[in-house]
Structures are given as C-alpha cells and as structure tokens.
Amino acid sequence: MKQKLSIILILGLVIFIIVKNNNFRKTYLEESDTVGVYINNELSDKIPSKDEATFYKAICDDKNVSVSWDNESWGLLLKNLTKKAKCNLYFYQGDTVFNFDYTGSEQTFTAPVSGIYKLETWGAQGGSYSNEYYGGYGGYSKGEINLLEKQTVNIVVGGSGESESSKLSQGGYNGGGNGDYQRGFEDKRFFGSGGGATHVSTKIGLLSELTNYKNSILIVSGGGGGSFYDGPNSTSACGGAGGGFKGKEGFVTNNGWGTAGYGGTQNNAGYSICDENTCNATNNPLEKKIYGEGSFGLGGTNAVSASSGGGSGFYGGGASVHVQSGGGGSSYIGNPLLTNKVMYCYNCEESNEESTKTISTTCSEETPTENCAKKGNGYARITLVSIGE
C-alpha cells in the first residue's frame, strides 16, 4: 500500500512529512529527478528566488498528486506524492510591464508567456494655442485580455495636434483631423488640429485602415479636438475632449457662425452644421450644410472654411464650422474578448453599460496616469497580470 505523503519545497530544499499515528517524522529527499525546475520553459539547476521570477504552474505525472503553491513563503505543497512521481515547476523570469511611447509609427508587442494582460491606452491631445486655450485632452481606456505565449498585437500611439495661424495645422498621427487657417487673419487667429487616437489590435494598420476588420480591434482611446484662438475679438475656445463612449463637443464662442464639432460616438462620426439657426450672422457667406464630418478612425477636416480639426477615435470628432473648436473622438472597449474594462474622459457624459462603460474625470496629466485624461502625445501600456497554465 502506498503511503500518503506531503512535501514542502522551499528554495531547493525538499522535506517529506510522513503522517503516522499523528506523529511527524522528517526525511530529506535524495533522488535528484523527482522535481524539475523550468525558467521560461528552459531546464534550470536551481529554483529562482522570489524577487527573480514568478511561479505560475506545477505539473506532476501522477494525477493523484495534489499541488499548491504558497507565494508568500515561496514554497510548494504536494500531497499524496510517491517516490516514483515526477513533478515540474515552471517560472517566468522577465519584464511584466511594457510601455509604448509616441514614435509616429506602428509598434508591436509579443506576449512572453501565456496569461492575462492589462491593456491601457491614452489618446492624444488636440492642438493648443496656450495653457488657457488648449486642445481637448485624450481619453483613457483599460481592459484585460488573455494572450497566448508568442501571440503578437499591434499598437499605434496617437500624436498630438498643432495650432497654426498662417498654414495648415497637421492632424495628429493616427487620424487627427487637420485645422485650416483663415486668409487675411494670419498671426491673429489660430486653428488647432485634432489629436490622434491610440489603439491596440490583432491586425496591423492605422485605425482608419481597420474599417473592415473591426473585430481585430481590442481597445481604443480617442483624441481631443483642436482649439481656436481669436486674438482680435477675444472669442476663443478649448477643443472638445476625446474618449468615452461619446467624444465631447467643441465649444461655440462666435454665435451665428455655425457650430463647433460634435464628438464621435460608437456608431457615427462627429460633424458641424451651418443652418438657419446657427449661421444667421450678418454677412455670413457660408453655405447652409454639414461641414467637417469625421469617419471611422479619422477626425473631421473642414476643407471649405477656416476651422479647427476633430480628434480621431473609434469614430472621429467633427471639425468646426469656421471660428469654433473641434470635437473629440470616441474610445472603444466593445470587443467581447476584453474584460474588466472601462473608459475615462475629461468632464464628459457617463455610461454604465458594460461595453461602453464611461467615467468622467477632472484629472489630466502629461505623464500617462491610470484613470486620467492625457495631455500631449498619446501612450500605451501592457502589463502582465497573471500567468496562465
């Protein structure tokens, strides 16, 4: 009859505790092939210390053996072990946090080990004239996903917008809408461009290139709309914030000259409009119609009149009609593979639905900060939360 044994393994020392008549007797294991140690799937001659690696699984060839790991004491408890049983311990040694700053190009991440990873993205800010008249802040999104070892995902970090008075304001990388200057008002009126979105996907490409591959998109953070500064009249406006299930509308400061850009949503892009009610200023020559409509992955650009650009996003925000600011782009956490997910945006509308959960925040930081809107360029971070078997 086989004896029922318990074994504790602490930093390479194996101790048998044999239970008989409620008395304990310690015996040291001499067989060197009973326990194997693997670090990053390579055989090792020693167990790494707690600060060197992360334990993630133990496999025994005898199904009757019960295995558990005590991370606090850094020890393994095996029950019902026999001398013929062989158990292998597996450890991961390497980075657990992976940061992706703005580079103006696509980046990739390859999972070093199978497990649950936390995805965090920050969209980019729209073009700012000053700290007082600033472009809309980029949104923040987070969620968790299960990735397999060596599985690769694509990361695109959005670039911030510009603010110009005598030339085109180029939209931020990854879809920010352009801002266009007003002839005759050079160095007086400044129009900002939209900030770019930041996204993580399983397919390579800028966000706008994934229109027919939406299932590949894991997470998105929208960029902010461009600001507007009007020196002669002191009628200036900040851009609409990006992020959340619906990007924030820009600000109207010149009544009678159209609307600011509306924010993008989960299904439609933002735009601005000139009609009998919004374009009723004397001598307003603008045609009554919709202007500056964004699209999937692109902030709006108004090619007809001087305007501020819309922020990029799952759906981009609209560019303004003339002398107003641009709208923010929307974020996205709707992929069913994503869990524990939420979006944050600056002073925005909230949602409690799981696939569009949005929380409004008054936090905005240059440094990428959890649950905070983003100033400047976007950012992305991937963190290994737990290792799978």
Region locations from a protein language model:
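Secretome/extracellular-domain signature
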Residues: G135-G258
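Extracellular low-complexity, Gly/Ser/Thr-rich intrinsically disordered linkers
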Residues: Y291-I387
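GGW-centered surface loops in extracellular recognition modules
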Residues: G94-S128, N212, R381
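Ser/Thr/Pro/Gly-rich low-complexity linker/stalk segments immediately outside membranes or between
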Residues: N23-G36
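Extracellular and analogous surface-interaction loops
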Residues: D101, E106-Y117, G143-Q151, V200-S208, ...
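Short, structured beta-strand segments at or near domain termini in extracellular proteins/domains
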Residues: N88-F91, T198, V220, K374-G388
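Short strand-edge motifs at loop-to-beta-strand transitions and within beta-strands
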Residues: W74-L76, Q107, G139-G143
